[in-house]
Amino acid sequence: MPTTLHTTSSTEQDWDDIIDSLEAEKCVLFLGSGVYQAPGGDSLETSLAKWLETEQTQHPSIQVYNDDGFFLFRNARSHKRKVTAQIKNFYSQAFPETSARFAQLAQLPFNIIVSLMPDNILVRTFDELGLNYQPDFYFRNRKYPEHFEKPAKNKPLIYNLMGNIEEPESLVLTHSDFFDYLESMFLARSMHPDLREELEGAERYIFLGLPYEKWYFQLLLRVLSMHSEKLKDVERLALQEFQNPKLQTLYAEEFKINFFPSNPEVFIADLYQACQRSGVLKKLPTPDPKLAQLPDLSAAELKELIASAQTEQAISHLKAFLDRRKPRSYSLVNDLVVLRNQYNLLRQRELRATIDSRDLPVEHNQIVERLMDLIDQAEGLG
């Protein structure tokens, strides 16, 4: 049965016990918005609300933006699509503080990381570090992919539990979406049974930055535990990230969550140091010398690679070109990281047959168009 640690200080924490469960691939990490720091230092929710200008009294697309984070759109389809595109742009920004935390987290030997967020900042970080991973996400009321690769610490599963921004129809943005999502979870429609078995077989869950104060989180925890006696009884380690003692008592008693007085940034740093002392951090791959030796290509030559269906090679050449022009190229480097991540995710979805064949060329062409635009901008760097 999964175990947890009782409330203690970070200096007294039994890191060896956590490391043992990590090494045994029996420790699952759950991430929420509290792990993030948005550009400018705001919380993720505050920054996203500003980005979407939700305070407008006559917002053209959003009729109501609730405190629980759910939207009511003026037009359910067209306005939802517009706001989804804005949210995608928001997460495509550079998140330097969050990326720094994730760079430490990516080197920890978790075999499964479950995110309640829809973004791909963590997988972008894995890409930047050259670390292996497998991405997947929950798509409510859709059949899960037939293929399932067992997660491993050298190739962890990064699983977006409430949809992925690259698949807009999978996102949970409205109350209606959420109740559809709960129905899908209740009927066990869209999560691969082998993944559920992996979650049931864990010895420890670690919760970081989850929305304990939101009304729907309690409901989500209950529904997630309905199909397994093991999941109902799982004990969890979580950080004491809120001040309401009644709420803490509720989670401690109802959900067997034991709280640890810390915050995500400190906890990740402390666990990183403990893993470093124990010699279990993942080793970062050495830079590919072939990439450094790639010649600079002109914009016309890069576009010719794209025209010849050599998109991946064009991305590699553009990366080498931009790397040689830092710091002037930093903003374009970040844009290319986002684009490369989107390309890799699209390839993964194609291989796993989780994308409609009609959508594949459309999304590929969108990536190519953005790549061509980056090439044009890079040409100005000389």
Q: PLM features: residue spans?
A:
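Conserved small-residue packing positions in alpha-helical repeats and bundles
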Residues: 301-302
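Gly/serine-rich nucleotide phosphate-binding loop at the start of the catalytic core
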Residues: 1-106, 111-114, 119-122, 132, ...
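Short, charge-rich amphipathic alpha-helical segments embedded
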Residues: 313-349
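Death-fold interaction domains
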Residues: 347-382
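Hydrophobic/aromatic side-chain positions at a characteristic register within alpha-helices
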Residues: 306-307
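Active-site gating loop/helix substructures
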Residues: 133-200
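SIR2/sirtuin-family catalytic core signature
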Residues: 1-29, 35-39, 100, 129-131, ...
